[in-house]
Amino acid sequence: AHVVPGIDENYLNGKMTSVFFDTLVILIAVSLVALEIVVVLSASQLSEPFRVAELALNRRAAGDLRQYQSGMGNGRLANFIRTLNTYNATLRDKLKSALDSVKDVGRREKLSELSERSKLFVTDARQQASIMDARIPLFVFCFAEELQKSFLPLFVAEFYSENDLFSRDIMMGLPISAFMFVIAVFTPFAGKLVDKFGNKPLFLAGLVPAIGGYLMCYLAQSGNDIFLGRSMTAIGYAVITISCQSYIASVVVVENRARGMAVFVGVLMSATMCGTAIGAILADWLGFKAVFLFAIGFALVAALLGWGMLSTDLPEPELKKTPVNLSKSPIATLLRNSQFVLIVLFCAIPAKVILTGFLYLFVPIYLASLEATQSEIGRVMMLYSLIIIPLSPFASGFADRLGKNLWMVIIATIASGIVLLGLYQNASVAMVLGVVAALGGVHAFLKAPLIVAAMEAAEKSPDITRTGALSLLRTSERIGSVIGPVVVAGMLVVLDFGEVAAILGITVAILGLIMAALSFNQKSRGSYV
């Protein structure tokens, strides 16, 4: 007898294909990180200085000799504008001296007309805040947070002990549900804290519980420890995201709100994709716990970036007078605004149910039943973010031009339900891939307009601030995030995958149609436009 060595070509080809796609994922993640840095640097060092210089030159050419906004830094363009301001200040001082010395009434009137026409005594208000200030700090923190997403259930299973609160299967999903639940509970309080103490201090303060949660997970010896660590991190996540979202909402003008919110959504999507991919690779190389050390490191970097980049020079928040007979409770405030409640119940919550229940729970289980590999499951789930990232700016710009954010949200809600029907009696990995891609495209047209539509509805109430509306919206969305996996898991106990997808899709589409009918009825009565 003799042994003949051989190589299974199919196995080798499969491994090479897996390596190729893993390398591609890393390349995409690194490219997105580089893109975030390039966008911020180009905006702060090129676009904004040239915009400020162009505005100053156009005003000077038109005879407007005010003190122009010079921007930040000591670059050539900023120094050029400061030189113009010096010349204008010299003319202003000479004009002031002439006005003080001239006694003739006619000459004084002509000098006063020159002063009004040239605006020599006007000084532009200096606003240092920009959307780009929050982009990099938010991205780095969210990147740190998403590092554990791909392996958290496996991490809990590895450290499960008999003394944990529940059985092993329940404990594997409990930290995820706890994370969403804590965010839902704490977000309204986070919004109030931002209004009281400001965006920058709260961003930095939110990093304390976030880092504490990462450290607790690193030191964890049981599922209970991981559960507590993720709950602690959720407090920091709620504070930081509301702080950055309110910061962006404060800076952008009303006409560009959807585009400004698209920056927030785009950062979250980019960080989700990059963090999930890089975290999986780090866990494979170094182990689960080492990833939390990287999360702590990136969170500290986010703290340094937030300290250096976030500005305290923000426009004053709107101050609305609250009638004495109205409660200041956030829940009571929400219930009094019917349009806000409709958006939350029929659009925001269903969108999160689809995201957490379908994408995070249904898709992995369904693909595993179709004998897809773990790498294939990860790539399919990442496609959702990959679709949203490039489409979100286009969708938000389209919503700004159309000026119909509410109807954009309604149509996208109906479409997201219809998309899920594609899985009914279609059991294939390719069909799941197509549905996830289509869902990403639909949600690209939903995410930013949903935030704007909620703020527009909130502005109709005299006692809801911008930050309060955002926090209430986020709280409601987290409720959908908590109940989504529970609802889908309950249906999977008694129904097959195709039936669950069909029921979920039909339900969401019907909710969207009900929202359309109610909104059209309100519009016809003139109560909401």
Regions found by a protein language model. Give the residues of each.
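Juxtamembrane intracellular "pre-TM" segments in multi-pass secondary transporters
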Residues: 114-128, 311-344
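Structural signature of the two symmetry-related core transmembrane helices
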Residues: 201-215, 296, 407-421
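Membrane-proximal alpha-helical signal-transduction linkers
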Residues: 46-67, 81, 85-95, 99-102
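Intracellular juxtamembrane helix-capping segments at the cytosolic ends
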Residues: 239-252, 446-460
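Helix-to-loop junctions at the C-terminal end of transmembrane segments
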Residues: 185-198, 392-403
